[in-house]
Amino acid sequence: MSMTQKRGLGRGLSDLGLNELLTEINDASLADSKTELKKLTIDVIQPGRYQPRRQMDKDALEELANSIRAQGIIQPIVVRPVGQRYEIIAGERRWRAAQLAGLKEVPAVIRPITDEAAITMSLIENIQRQNLNAIEEAAALQRLLDEFKMTHEEIAEAVGKSRTSVTNSLRLLKLNPDVKALLEQGHLDMGHARALLALEGFQQSEAANIIIKRALSVRETEKLIQHWQSEGKSSANRPSMDPDVARLQHHLSDKLGAAVTIRHGAKGKGKLIIHYNSADELEGILDRIR
């Protein structure tokens, strides 16, 4: 990618044709002569390479499929031609739900755009529609930062958020893998996560597990962390975790793609707890174990 391409977004969304695409996604209007609206067969469409969503809830997809069976697809998906096929820029959930509904073809807005515009559009569309969980959104913002060398201010303008919001979101990527998994699965909220950033290493993971076990509010979490910090590492009120156990906990979380808690007893006995938030997530964990 050239420096001109890397700085492309700094010139504004219009330079990538994204203003027109956003309009098409919102109301399916045809922005210019390069845009075409037609029905495409399901099998000539493929998922977008730049889809930032890592999880799609099966129950929500089935609900959407039921809606499509009853009313059809009201809003076309947006695709771009890739060889003899079409790659999804926006609307992968609709495409997958259409397959569940038994449709053979779907309405699509076809727009020939560059890789640069495709990745940016996929990220922006998902962020603006709030389709992403906090970690997916942070990872998407990081890609805009890394792949296009955008500033936090440019990203904020592109996705319609404040600069502070973008910066705080990106900071979530510094969380431990197991803590990020807990946030993704809804066991922690953004307030808890921001407070946990004040801790590092296994202490952060310990605190996250205490938050869940005691059902602490964000304010209670902040007080706990402030107390730990003021008391120092020797505080009798702070539980300890063996660093080797903490490393194993992080390793298992990475391998399983889920938050893992290890509670190791004094006599060698303990518990291994794998956290999941839906039957779909459990199925994914079992697939990795098999």
UniProtKB/Swiss-Prot annotation:
Q: Which SMART domains match?
A: ParB (SM00470)
Report the SUPFAM superfamilies cross-referenced here: ParB/Sulfiredoxin
- Enumerate the UniProt keywords alphabetically: Chromosome partition, DNA-binding
* MF GO annotations: DNA binding
Annotated GO biological process = chromosome segregation; positive regulation of sporulation resulting in formation of a cellular spore
One Pfam entry for this protein is ParB_dimer
GO annotations of cellular component type: chromosome
- What is the superkingdom listed in this entry's lineage? Bacteria
Q: What role does it play?
A: Involved in chromosome partition. Localize to both poles of the predivisional cell following completion of DNA replication. Binds to the DNA origin of replication.
Q: What family is it from?
A: Belongs to the ParB family.
Report the NCBIfam families cross-referenced here: parB_part
Query: What protein name does the entry list?
Result: Probable chromosome-partitioning protein ParB
This chain's source organism reads: Coxiella burnetii (strain RSA 493 / Nine Mile phase I)
